[in-house]
Protein backbone atom coordinates (compact mmCIF):
# COMPACT_ATOMS: atom_id res chain seq x y z
CA UNK A 1 0.00 0.00 0.00
CA UNK A 2 1.37 3.37 -1.01
CA UNK A 3 1.33 6.10 1.64
CA UNK A 4 0.36 9.54 0.34
CA UNK A 5 1.00 12.63 2.41
CA UNK A 6 -1.22 15.69 2.37
CA UNK A 7 0.40 19.09 2.97
CA UNK A 8 -1.69 20.96 5.55
CA UNK A 9 0.54 24.02 5.62
CA UNK A 10 3.74 25.35 7.17
CA UNK A 11 5.69 22.14 6.57
CA UNK A 12 3.10 19.89 8.24
CA UNK A 13 1.67 16.79 6.58
CA UNK A 14 -0.88 14.09 7.36
CA UNK A 15 -1.51 10.72 5.75
CA UNK A 16 -4.13 11.43 3.07
CA UNK A 17 -5.92 8.08 3.46
CA UNK A 18 -6.63 8.79 7.14
CA UNK A 19 -8.55 12.03 6.47
CA UNK A 20 -12.33 11.76 6.90
CA UNK A 21 -13.35 15.42 6.70
CA UNK A 22 -11.94 18.90 6.17
CA UNK A 23 -14.23 21.55 7.64
CA UNK A 24 -14.34 25.24 8.44
CA UNK A 25 -13.91 26.08 12.15
CA UNK A 26 -16.48 28.91 12.21
CA UNK A 27 -19.60 27.06 13.37
CA UNK A 28 -20.50 26.29 16.98
CA UNK A 29 -20.48 22.49 16.45
CA UNK A 30 -16.93 22.67 15.10
CA UNK A 31 -15.84 24.75 18.09
CA UNK A 32 -17.40 22.11 20.35
CA UNK A 33 -15.65 19.34 18.40
CA UNK A 34 -12.34 21.14 18.88
CA UNK A 35 -12.89 21.58 22.61
CA UNK A 36 -13.99 17.95 23.05
CA UNK A 37 -10.83 16.78 21.27
CA UNK A 38 -8.72 19.02 23.52
CA UNK A 39 -10.32 17.44 26.62
CA UNK A 40 -9.71 13.92 25.23
CA UNK A 41 -6.06 14.73 24.33
CA UNK A 42 -6.80 14.10 20.65
CA UNK A 43 -6.20 17.64 19.38
CA UNK A 44 -3.19 18.34 17.15
CA UNK A 45 -2.42 22.02 16.57
CA UNK A 46 -0.57 22.46 13.25
CA UNK A 47 -1.34 26.19 12.91
CA UNK A 48 2.18 27.29 13.91
CA UNK A 49 0.65 30.04 16.05
CA UNK A 50 -1.59 31.35 13.29
CA UNK A 51 -5.36 31.57 13.15
CA UNK A 52 -7.20 28.26 12.67
CA UNK A 53 -8.70 28.17 9.16
CA UNK A 54 -9.48 24.47 8.80
CA UNK A 55 -10.25 21.50 11.01
CA UNK A 56 -9.23 18.06 9.76
CA UNK A 57 -10.96 14.98 11.18
CA UNK A 58 -9.13 11.65 10.94
CA UNK A 59 -10.32 8.06 11.14
CA UNK A 60 -8.63 7.70 14.55
CA UNK A 61 -10.86 10.49 15.95
CA UNK A 62 -7.95 12.93 16.09
CA UNK A 63 -8.72 16.55 15.27
CA UNK A 64 -6.01 18.51 13.45
CA UNK A 65 -6.05 22.31 13.29
CA UNK A 66 -4.52 23.97 10.23
CA UNK A 67 -3.75 27.57 9.35
CA UNK A 68 -4.61 26.93 5.69
CA UNK A 69 -8.12 27.35 4.25
CA UNK A 70 -10.26 24.19 4.09
CA UNK A 71 -10.83 24.69 0.35
CA UNK A 72 -7.07 24.82 -0.28
CA UNK A 73 -6.46 21.59 1.63
CA UNK A 74 -9.35 19.88 -0.20
CA UNK A 75 -7.89 20.97 -3.53
CA UNK A 76 -4.48 19.60 -2.53
CA UNK A 77 -6.13 16.32 -1.58
CA UNK A 78 -7.69 16.11 -5.05
CA UNK A 79 -4.62 17.12 -7.06
CA UNK A 80 -2.11 15.05 -5.11
CA UNK A 81 -4.11 11.87 -5.63
CA UNK A 82 -5.20 11.45 -2.02
CA UNK A 83 -8.78 10.70 -3.04
CA UNK A 84 -9.36 7.50 -4.98
CA UNK A 85 -12.82 8.35 -6.31
CA UNK A 86 -13.04 12.00 -7.34
CA UNK A 87 -16.70 11.62 -8.37
CA UNK A 88 -17.61 10.52 -4.85
CA UNK A 89 -16.02 13.66 -3.39
CA UNK A 90 -17.75 15.91 -5.94
CA UNK A 91 -21.12 14.32 -5.07
CA UNK A 92 -20.48 14.98 -1.38
CA UNK A 93 -19.84 18.67 -2.13
CA UNK A 94 -23.22 19.06 -3.90
From Swiss-Prot:
InterPro entries assigned: RemA-like
HAMAP family attached to this UniProt entry: RemA (MF_01503)
Family: Belongs to the RemA family.
Protein name: Putative regulatory protein Sfum_3631
Gene source species: Syntrophobacter fumaroxidans (strain DSM 10017 / MPOB)
Lineage: Bacteria, Pseudomonadati, Thermodesulfobacteriota, Syntrophobacteria, Syntrophobacterales
Amino acid sequence: MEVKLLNIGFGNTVIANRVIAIVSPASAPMKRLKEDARQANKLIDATMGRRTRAIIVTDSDHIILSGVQAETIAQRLLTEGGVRDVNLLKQAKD
